[in-house]
UniProtKB/Swiss-Prot annotation:
Name the UniProt record assigns to this protein: Nuclear/nucleolar GTPase 2
Gene3D superfamilies, per the entry: 1.10.1580.10, P-loop containing nucleotide triphosphate hydrolases
Annotated Basic and acidic residues bias: 17-29
Keyword Lyase: no
PROSITE patterns per UniProt: G_CP
Species in which this protein is naturally found: Oryza sativa subsp. indica
UniProt GO cellular component terms: nucleolus
Length: 535
């Protein structure tokens, strides 16, 4: 067979084929020439063009003889007849599975326990799935009476035999729907009492919009640990039971932690009582958000590091901070970072959308807007919880009566230098004259004065707190006075020592209950000792 001659490279100015290296590019500025234009094709261009013409070499029968840019077919192989290739990798009998299921349910009832290596557990076998309700058609009417030669009806009878049973079934389903949705039930109770607010300003529905709830669910879905921030002055009033129910039903693998913020506004015995009460449900920490002088920062960092170690199968964990508006979620994040990374303000609704903050390489923080779950709170309760901005209130004086009822008279005398008053209107008139809030003609400006009082209420200048239930031996009598920030400058050394002793009592009680706690008051070092959770 004659040897095939190789095509010689054309050195003339006009190449004969497109694969010639010396062929110039058509476009100016392209090609492999040194000058950028008029040069020959580069080696990469030649290889690319040659690739377009490459095909596998086949014989007359179509069998591939030589592969070119094709995957080679592996020859038929024989698998070694070993039991390890075909046997079960993990085997468990019914008795062991039942024992493990009971043990798992008993351990998961305690919110301080954490499942390790969730991906290796057959959770689908350990959880009892709810079965769908079946319509027992054969109990209502036999099969032969509905179909076949003896059939008497064109359709089989359903659960409702007549209109009365159908109406009863509809009423039952409506009752179940109303029980599930608390708002409908509350409206029904209001109608029975004969009182119902037909018109309510949209301002009192802040934190309940679809957009805000969407932000909350995005934060929950993205978080491995959810920290619910509560106001230490009214923890139960700022607690969202709907969120806890949602996590139990739909996200059992996520962990919930309570954070009692603003504990500097309440006495130590009240903080201790709320820690005992809330720790029965979820891990609870006391916290005071401040970049310079914080309390509880070491405990919270220790808990977050512990969760990061427990989630060792993940590269990083996300911690979402949720709660009512104006409870200090953004301030807590700024305290953990020791600098201002989130926009904060003493007014509700400052955070509009969720925000990712990097704490460490393995811990990320998520700031969430304040969310309010619709309940039977009145407009005054909504204002006093800090959900509504005081500057937007049309008539702020109508909420002062509740403030005078909740706060002791001696604290108001000490704060506003007013000796006595008859009602809320008289109180506002005297305060307007004292502070110089007057209109033309010397008339008192009641609206501006009322807004000033509500601002002082929301910012903690007026001492107020809800006492914890089942007060123990450490709690004082009912005549105990709340913390008054106006006397902080004149506190003697004896009272300071007593306060430090009470805080030490809180820390010791947390250690006895296996609650993560901060070892020293005022410690902000991130390398503090890790608190251990109960197993």
């Amino acid at each position: 067979m004659a040897k095939k001659k190789e095509r010689a490279v054309n050195v003339s100015g006009k190449p004969r084929h497109s694969l010639d290296v010396n062929r110039a590019n058509d476009k100016k500025g392209a090609g492999g020439g040194a000058g950028g234009g008029g040069g020959g094709r580069s080696a990469a261009t030649v290889r690319r063009l040659k690739m377009y013409k490459m095909r596998p070499l086949r014989d007359r029968g179509g069998k591939i003889l030589k592969h070119d840019l094709q995957s080679k077919e592996l020859p038929n192989t024989r698998i070694e007849p070993d039991r390890r290739w075909f046997g079960n990798t993990r085997v468990v009998n019914q008795k062991e599975l039942e024992f493990f299921r009971e043990e798992l349910q008993s351990r998961l009832s305690n919110n301080y326990n954490v499942i390790l290596k969730e991906r290796k557990l057959p959770l689908s076998l350990l959880q009892d799935h709810q079965k769908q309700a079946r319509a027992h058609l054969l109990d209502t009417e036999p099969f032969e009476h509905a179909f076949g030669p003896k059939g008497k009806r064109k359709r089989p009878k359903l659960m409702a035999l007549d209109y009365e049973s159908l109406l009863k079934k509809a009423d039952d389903s409506q009752g179940a729907f109303e029980d599930k949705h608390a708002t409908a039930k509350l409206l029904k109770e209001e109608e029975e009492d004969g009182l119902r607010d037909l018109v309510r300003h949209t301002m009192f529905e802040k934190g309940q919009s679809k957009r805000i709830w969407g932000e909350l669910y995005k934060v929950i879905d993205s978080s491995d640990v959810v920290v619910q921030v509560l106001d230490a002055r009214d923890p139960m009033g700022t607690r969202c039971y709907h969120l806890e129910k949602h996590l139990k039903e739909n996200a059992k693998h996520k962990h919930l932690v309570f954070l009692l913020n603003k504990c500097d506004l309440v006495p130590a015995w009240a903080t201790k009582g709320w820690l005992r009460t809330l720790s029965k449900d979820y891990p609870t920490l006391a916290f005071h958000a401040s970049i310079n002088s914080s309390f509880g920062k070491g405990s919270l960092l220790s808990v977050l590091r512990q969760f990061a170690r427990l989630k060792s199968d993940k590269q990083a964990i996300s911690v979402g901070f949720v709660g009512y508006p104006n409870v200090g979620k953004s301030s807590v994040i700024n305290t953990l970072r020791s600098k201002s990374v989130c926009k904060v303000a003493p007014i509700p609704g400052e955070t509009k959308v969720w925000q990712y903050i990097t704490l460490t390489k393995r811990i990320f923080l998520i700031d969430c807007p304040g969310v309010v779950y619709q309940n039977n709170d009145s407009e005054t309760d909504i204002v006093l919880k800090g959900v509504v901005r005081v500057t937007n209130l049309a008539d702020a004086s109508e909420h002062i009566g509740e403030v005078l009822r909740r706060v002791k008279k001696e604290h108001l005398k000490r704060a506003y230098k007013i000796e006595d008053w008859v009602d809320d209107n008289d109180f506002l008139v005297q305060l307007s004259k004292t502070t110089g809030k007057l209109l033309r003609g010397g008339e008192p400006d009641l609206t501006t004065t009322a807004k000033m009082v509500l601002h002082d209420w929301q910012r903690g200048k007026i001492p107020f707190f809800v006492p914890p239930p089942q007060q123990g031996e450490d709690s004082p009598s009912e005549t105990a006075e709340p913390v008054d920030k106006s006397d902080e400058e004149g506190v003697s050394s004896d009272r300071t020592a007593a306060a430090m002793k009470a805080i030490a009592g809180i820390i010791s009680s947390q250690q006895q209950m296996n609650v993560p706690c901060q070892k020293e008051f005022g410690v902000t070092n991130e390398d503090s000792e890790v608190a251990e959770q109960s197993e």
